[in-house]
UniProtKB/Swiss-Prot annotation:
Promotes tail assembly by creating a scaffold for the tail tube proteins. Tail assembly proteins E and E' would wrap the linear tape measure protein to create a tail assembly scaffold. It comes from Escherichia phage P2. It holds the Pfam family Phage_P2_GpE. This is Tail assembly protein E'. GO terms for biological process: viral tail assembly; viral translational frameshifting. It comes from the Viruses. Keywords: Late protein, Viral release from host cell, Viral tail assembly. The keyword Plastid does not apply. Belongs to the mulikevirus tail assembly protein family.
Length: 142
């Protein structure tokens, strides 16, 4: 795993006898970001981070542990999450109401793919397939 994706927590997470001092972030896939707005993740909204960080951290933090993080630790983790999005998509502005679920639904409806085919896709792949789905459906206004 890339050492750049490792965050040393200023205030370690205590889980019973275990003390988590470092957290490794994994590059998110479409499945990782399901159920949240891309704009919310890109803007580091706390509710979105509480949802996605447990899906992309090792050791896996719980939603309760993420919610209890000290601000400097949450900001450090959020910076890595946003870094993944910027590296993957560039300077893309997401409409407030656009979610990964919306992208997946557009692709699934047109191409009849099950979610299991879509979850492993990167955001770039998912957006590319959504554009193809919109063109195929004749809806190019989005």
């Amino acid at each position: 795993m890339n050492k750049e994706n490792v965050i040393t927590l200023d205030n370690p997470v205590k889980r019973g006898e275990q003390v988590i001092e470092q957290v490794t972030l994994m590059k998110p896939s479409a499945g990782t970001l399901r159920g949240v707005s891309l704009a919310a993740v890109a803007n580091s909204e706390v509710d979105a981070l509480i949802k996605v960080l447990p899906r992309m951290t090792a050791p896996m933090l719980t939603e309760q542990e993420v919610a209890a993080l000290e601000l400097p630790d949450l900001v450090a983790l959020a910076g890595k999450v946003v870094g993944f999005l910027v590296a993957e998509l560039g300077a893309v502005t997401f409409p407030k109401n656009l979610s990964v679920d919306d992208l997946m639904a557009d692709v699934a409806v047109i191409f009849h793919w099950p979610p299991s085919e879509l979850y492993p896709m990167s955001l770039t792949e998912l957006i590319t397939w959504r554009e193809k789905a919109l063109r195929r459906s004749g809806n190019t206004n989005e």
